[in-house]
Amino acid sequence: MRLSRFFLPILKENPKEAEIVSHRLMLRAGMLRQEAAGIYAWLPLGHRVLKKIEQIVREEQNRAGAIELLMPTLQLADLWRESGRYDAYGPEMLRIADRHKRELLYGPTNEEMITEIFRAYVKSYKSLPLNLYHIQWKFRDEQRPRFGVMRGREFLMKDAYSFDVDEAAARKSYNRMFVAYLRTFARMGLKAIPMRAETGPIGGDLSHEFIVLAETGESGVYCDRDVLNLPVPGEDVDYDGDLTPIIQQWTSVYAATEDVHDAARYESEVPEANRLNTRGIEVGQIFYFGTKYSDSMKANVAGPDGADAPIHGGSYGVGVSRLVGAIIEACHDENGIKWPEEVAPFRVAILNLKQGDAQTDAACEQLYRELAAKGVDVLYDDTDQRAGAKFATADLIGIPWQVLVGPKGLADGKVELKRRSDGSRETIALAEAVARLAP
């Protein structure tokens, strides 16, 4: 992509309404535009990051055996009355009536609808286990939306729902999602810690929140520092095998949100030097809720003995749009964003330091075409801005690799390669640049 043809409305000043770093940088970098309180238009740069995150989530869900579908944003109110949650959910739910006076709602979550789909088609235990997921926009009418995408009213979410014949099988499904989440967040360059949490209106007796440590987080957290060094399962993890050792390794180390924090246990189990009391950002949460929805909505299957029994369920959410903000909170400096490579809007930025110079233009053009031909996401700054402005833009928007091309270096057949994550620079031969930057 040539920057001269890209829509990148960068702001020079910090927006007054932005209270935290991620919100400020997303607005300054031209990733978002606020259209109403807690509702944003995703501009091209932000949309590219959003799609990268969405794809990682999708790949890891598929790897764990979940199957993708797509449910609508609008749901029938009667489904929620059937489960008993319509009145209990409160003013966060946006209730709507169509022209025929049918009561609808803009879905804040999808337990009811997925249960309705399941019960319409699945009648026997032989079709289980089953895990269905979708990635869809949701709406919760937050009383005080703030912090940009961290606490917006409209948000993109991945929610998965597992269906099993009994509790033992359901807990295996829970463990699969637990491991899938560890891998998902690690691929994004995040250290997300699973912490015991309350189940809230979703229900059930088992839940973990996945928390990214950040002082701007809304959740108070207490954990043993050892959890920061635990290994994340590799790509070869066997989801059909016994995942218990992985789960035990991660859950045996103390880590809890403030809602379920046990101060006495914390002080007795965790050496004082290892205690970490801080704040964090919730980027995902998983639940085992047993027969909560199948009981009320009559979602039964015939078991091995031929008798009908309610299915055991779980739900598993990832805040896809929230993750954009969480990654920025964890990966930034005074100059802007430092995207991990897997989620960066572009992997490489080519900075033409003397636009209009024939040799420099030709070298940049050749490098741009060769990288693009190799499948590299590359942004070529071919604008007539001064070099300092180009450096500032590349740092602000966080491109992991910057190739600085100017007449002085080209006289020796050289370009400068800068790594955004640590600011390191090295001079390399122009002829080597493609091999260095193409994965």
UniProtKB/Swiss-Prot annotation:
GO molecular function: ATP binding; proline-tRNA ligase activity
UniProt catalytic activity: tRNA(Pro) + L-proline + ATP = L-prolyl-tRNA(Pro) + AMP + diphosphate
Record Gene3D superfamilies: Anticodon-binding domain, Bira Bifunctional Protein, Domain 2
Gene Ontology biological process: prolyl-tRNA aminoacylation
Subcellular location: Cytoplasm
Pfam families the record matches: HGTP_anticodon (PF03129), tRNA-synt_2b (PF00587)
Major location (coarse): cytoplasm
PROSITE patterns, per the entry: AA_TRNA_LIGASE_II
Alphabetically ordered keywords of this record: Aminoacyl-tRNA synthetase, ATP-binding, Cytoplasm, Ligase, Nucleotide-binding, Protein biosynthesis
Enzyme Commission code: 6.1.1.15
Entry GO CC: cytosol
Keyword Protein biosynthesis: yes
Entries under InterPro entries matching the protein: aa-tRNA-synt_IIb, aa-tRNA-synth_II, aa-tRNA-synth_II/BPL/LPL, Anticodon-bd, Anticodon-bd_dom_sf, Pro-tRNA-ligase_IIa, Pro-tRNA-synth_IIa_bac-type, Pro-tRNA_synthetase
Similarity remark: Belongs to the class-II aminoacyl-tRNA synthetase family. ProS type 2 subfamily.
Function: Catalyzes the attachment of proline to tRNA(Pro) in a two-step reaction: proline is first activated by ATP to form Pro-AMP and then transferred to the acceptor end of tRNA(Pro).
Subunit text: Homodimer.
Record NCBIfam families: PRK12325.1, proS_fam_II
This protein's name: Proline--tRNA ligase
Organism for this UniProt entry: Rhodopseudomonas palustris (strain BisB5)
Phylogenetic classification of the source organism: Bacteria, Pseudomonadati, Pseudomonadota, Alphaproteobacteria, Hyphomicrobiales
Gene that this polypeptide is encoded by: proS
